[in-house]
């Protein structure tokens, strides 16, 4: 009986994916409309006969992002079905990461996707920590690539305090999700109980208030 249950679970887990396999060539996301027809599984798709080449291309990642007004001196530009309609159901996301001097993508997770990053300009310190607490870090120079396993805490940091840096990432889900550890812990809505944060991080109530104020800007 136990063997049968384990075999069943193994088979089921092998079928679990962040994004389901598409059942057609493409499912271009249409502009919002109250008269939209449904072509697949309850999901909105443009009539395939109306799809055009512009649905499958975008210049969204060609424009540099402004890092000076952004928290952590980092600007992330992401492809979505709004700027790349043909992205719908293909199970991918692309992101442009512009770093200011000492810019950082703080420790965060993508619960539904693995990520591969290519450094295009500057030098980045990148890394992740596995579930045993082991840390893997590497300096990335232009043209070098690093992969972050799905669901693990990871970061990217521009080691130059003055010059900018640039990277492009690909993620294995149309909706990878992002949780920045510090923000999720200290400025969630509604907030965590102060007692929970005090115990979890071995800090006092004043520390909690100070950290929250700092993260909220």
From Swiss-Prot:
It comes from the Eukaryota. Residues 59-209 form the Cupin type-1 domain. It is found in: Secreted, Extracellular space, Apoplast. Its main location: secreted. GO terms for cellular component: apoplast. The keyword Glycoprotein applies. PROSITE patterns: GERMIN. Glycans are attached at residue 75. Belongs to the germin family. Oligomer (believed to be a pentamer but probably hexamer). May play a role in plant defense. Probably has no oxalate oxidase activity even if the active site is conserved. PANTHER family: GERMIN-LIKE PROTEIN SUBFAMILY 3 MEMBER 3. This is Germin-like protein subfamily 1 member 1. The lineage of its organism: Eukaryota, Viridiplantae, Streptophyta, Embryophyta, Tracheophyta.
């Amino acid at each position: 009986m136990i063997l049968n249950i384990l075999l069943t679970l193994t088979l089921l887990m092998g079928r679990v994916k962040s994004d389901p396999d598409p059942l057609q060539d493409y499912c271009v996301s249409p502009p919002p409309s109250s008269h939209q027809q449904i072509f697949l599984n309850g999901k909105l798709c443009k009539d395939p006969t109306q799809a055009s080449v512009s649905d499958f291309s975008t210049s969204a990642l060609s424009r540099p992002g402004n890092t000076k007004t952004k928290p952590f001196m980092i600007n992330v530009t992401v492809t979505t079905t709004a700027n790349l309609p043909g992205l719908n159901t293909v199970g991918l996301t692309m992101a442009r990461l512009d770093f200011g001097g000492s810019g950082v993508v703080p420790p965060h997770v993508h619960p539904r996707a693995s990520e591969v990053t290519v450094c295009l300009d500057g030098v980045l310190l990148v890394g992740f920590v596995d579930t045993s607490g082991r840390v893997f870090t590497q300096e990335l120079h232009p043209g070098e690539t690093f992969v972050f396993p799905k669901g693990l805490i990871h970061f990217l940091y521009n080691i130059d305090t003055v010059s900018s840096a640039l990277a492009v990432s690909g993620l294995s889900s149309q909706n990878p999700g992002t949780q920045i550890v510090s923000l999720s812990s200290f400025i969630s809505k509604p907030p965590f109980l102060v007692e929970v944060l005090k115990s979890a991080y071995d800090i006092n109530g004043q520390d909690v208030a100070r950290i929250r104020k700092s993260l909220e800007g």
